[in-house]
């Protein structure tokens, strides 16, 4: 009986250590604050952020990431442009390297927009702190925008983000449980 109890205690302790390691070094929880990603992610929802996988697999256009906006705040936004991309918007239409891109995650907000446009017209060189002579995203930089463009504070306001600002890629939403979702890339977005 004592041996069986000891085995249970050791098993539970090992499980907690594994959970701690996973939570500390692989996946961390994050609570969505604000409406900048609405309706994809809503205020108060909880997501799991993969803090290692994106470093080995890289970030792709369409990934949703959490990053350090400043010393006190982390933001969650969608990657629109990666290093080497030439990005521009013309009247709410995204062009990457000269090719028109679909943004299905904007469908809801386009239908319910308050003004003429939700994204507007801009090029990489128009962003704060960007090279005014180049529309190409430099190495180690990313262009990020919120899905709710009319309220989002994103690269249009603070410029491109540095790779070292990125905390990780959103892997899945786990709260509320009824809204569980594991992939936020454009081909898996329904709005």
From Swiss-Prot:
Stated family: Belongs to the peptidase S26 family.
EC number per UniProt: 3.4.21.89
One Gene Ontology term from the biological process aspect of the record: signal peptide processing
Membrane-spanning intervals of the chain: 8-28
GO cellular component, one term: plasma membrane
Subcellular location: Cell membrane
Entry annotation: catalytic residues: 36, 77
Record topology, Extracellular segments: 29-191
Catalytic activity field: Cleavage of hydrophobic, N-terminal signal or leader sequences from secreted and periplasmic proteins
Gene3D superfamilies, alphabetized: Umud Fragment, subunit A
Domain of life: Bacteria
Membrane topology field: Single-pass type II membrane protein
Family annotation (Pfam families): Peptidase_S26 (PF10502)
Principal subcellular localization: membrane
Lineage, opening ranks: Bacteria, Bacillati, Bacillota, Bacilli, Bacillales
Species this chain originates from: Staphylococcus aureus (strain Mu50 / ATCC 700699)
Ranges per topology, Cytoplasmic: 1-7
Function: Essential for cell viability.
Keywords: Cell membrane, Hydrolase, Membrane, Protease, Transmembrane, Transmembrane helix
Record-given protein name: Signal peptidase IB
InterPro entries documented for this protein: LexA/Signal_pep-like_sf, Pept_S26A_signal_pept_1, Pept_S26A_signal_pept_1_CS, Pept_S26A_signal_pept_1_Lys-AS, Pept_S26A_signal_pept_1_Ser-AS, Peptidase_S26
Top EC class, one word: hydrolase
GO terms of molecular function: serine-type endopeptidase activity
């Amino acid at each position: 009986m004592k041996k069986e109890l000891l085995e249970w205690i050791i098993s539970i302790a090992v499980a907690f250590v594994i959970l701690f390691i996973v939570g500390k070094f692989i996946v961390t929880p994050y609570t969505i604050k604000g409406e900048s990603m609405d309706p994809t992610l809503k205020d108060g929802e909880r997501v799991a952020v993969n803090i290692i996988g994106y470093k080995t697999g890289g970030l792709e256009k369409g990934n949703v990431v959490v990053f350090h906006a400043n010393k006190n705040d982390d933001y969650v936004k969608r990657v629109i442009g990666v290093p080497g991309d030439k990005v521009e918007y013309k009247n709410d239409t995204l062009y990457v390297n000269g090719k028109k891109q679909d943004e299905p995650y904007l469908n809801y907000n386009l239908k319910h927009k308050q003004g003429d446009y939700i994204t507007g017209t801009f090029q990489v060189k128009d962003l704060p702190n960007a090279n005014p002579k180049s529309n190409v995203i430099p190495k180690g930089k990313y262009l990020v925008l919120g899905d709710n463009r009319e309220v989002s504070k994103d690269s249009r306001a603070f410029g491109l983000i540095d790779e070292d600002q990125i905390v990780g890629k959103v892997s899945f939403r786990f709260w509320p449980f009824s809204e569980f979702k594991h992939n936020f890339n454009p081909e898996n977005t329904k709005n």
